[in-house]
Amino acid sequence: MRSKPFVVLLAWLALLVGQMAPAAANDLTRSVTSGDIAVNFGVVPASQTAAAGGSAADASSNVNLYLLTVALFDRSTGKRIENAHITAVVKGPRSEASSFHTKPKQMQLEAARDGNAVTYGHLFDARWKGIYHIDLAITRDGSTHVEHVRLNYDQQF
C-alpha cells in the first residue's frame, strides 16, 4: 500500500521534469524572433575563424576581437534571407567606474556566402566581462521597413 503513493509521486516528478527540460533548452539557444524574421546568431573569438570585416592578421593577433555572425530566416516560409542590409550597434557592459568601454559602436554587417547559405558578420571588441547588447536594424532589399532586433551576448572569461 505504501508503494502506490511512491509510484504516483515518482510519475508526477518525471512529468514535471519532462515539462521543464524543453524550457531550459530554449533558454540556451541563440535565436530571436521579431516580426517576420527569425535571427540566429553566434559570437566566437576572431582568432578561431576567418575574419569578416577585418584583416586576418588583425584577427589572429588581437585576443579581444570577436566575430558576430548572424543568419536570417523568414518566419512564414522558414527560408534563409539572402538579400538584407544589417546595421549593428554594439554596446559594451556597463561600468560604474568608467564609461569608456560602454560607448556604442556602429557597424555594417557584411554578407558572406558559404555554399548555398548566406550569413552576415563583423568583428567587434569584447574585452570586458559582462553582457553586450547588440541592436540590429535589418532591411530587406526592395523594402523600406526596418526590423529592429536586440541580441544579448554574455561575455565570460
Write out the residue ranges for each language-model feature.
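Positively charged n-region of N-terminal signal peptides that target proteins for export
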Residues: 1-5
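Bacterial N-terminal signal peptides
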Residues: 7-19
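Short solvent-exposed capping/turn motifs at the termini of beta-strands
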Residues: 72-76, 92
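Short amphipathic beta-strand segments in non-cytosolic proteins
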Residues: 87-108
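Aromatic sugar-binding surface patches on proteins
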Residues: 113-121
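Surface-exposed edge beta-strand/loop patches
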Residues: 121-157
